[in-house]
Amino acid sequence: LDGTAYSSASPVYYAGTDQDEEAQTSSTAVNLGDQLQIRLDAQGHPSKVVIDPELMWPVANLGAGGFTVNGVAVRVNSNAATGPVTYYTGLNDFSSRQDGMQVEVHGAYGQSADGKGYIQATRIEQLPASNPVTRLTGVVSNLNAANGSFQIGATVVQTQASTLITPSG
């Protein structure tokens, strides 16, 4: 991973489901382009690997170089010379996506020259149309601690006492 070799046999693997944030899975669940969180033990060996998408929700605002998910811009790329290539699961390519299609987006957070955040997609997976899970990643803006709200991209999030924000802090 990023130039460091790790044994894939030692850690326990987890992935989100439509019922749980993290459910145990096998190492074969890791796909090319997936974003991973790797937790190391005291000896520097992986003990836990979490397959961790950046966004989950329907596609909106399809354009030539991307789309939005939950108000967060997603950029796609097919040219290895200009950055990470976007891979697709359950889709043939960029043109097979449609507004309203449920997707899971893996990638890296970036900022444009004008300071707007986006996800540079490394993998996009089509999800079932009835997917109940929403996942949102980005920079928090318009934080209002008094009423428990904040904004990521164009999405306003209203928290409650039972809201879990990870990572905490």
Residue ranges of predicted features:
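Short, flexible, surface-exposed loop segments at domain boundaries
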Residues: 1-169
